[in-house]
Amino acid sequence: MSRHLQVTFDAHDPRALSSFWRDALGYVHPGPPGVDLPEDADPLAAWDDFLARIGVPEEQRNTKSAIEDPDGHGPRVFFQQVPEDKAAKNRVHLDVRAAPGLRGKERMAVLEAECDRLVALGAARVRRHEPAPPMNAGFIVMTDPNTRDYQFCAA
């Protein structure tokens, strides 16, 4: 039997970082348990109301956040607040696959457009790696807006 995967990020501001990745991946914030949200409702506002109703102090309401693939195919992504800064290089990175199957100039043009979209959401561009066939199709290294040190690739 296969297992479901959840990817967990440490963050100083879980809500802000989850909102960036929600927009980057086309994911959604799920609503609180037992709450049926109208289609146009803001799930983050619903979480604030839910947490207030169950007595969670306001200063503790941004300690966790999550996003999910609305189609149910991708992993759930969880964000947890931590006080410390990153101490070492990450040994894992995420590839945001914006150009699967494309090669050469066409691929890099799609990746540049994706890079521009992600920069508009708050990411930062680090460097572009040109295609080097047959093994490297080319990619762009970026950082997320939370830490500026977590690298991911538009690939």
Where in the sequence are the language-model features?
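Vicinal oxygen chelate
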Residues: 2-9, 23-25, 31-33, 37, ...
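A structural signal for well-ordered alpha-helical scaffolds and beta->alpha junctions
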Residues: 14, 60, 111-112
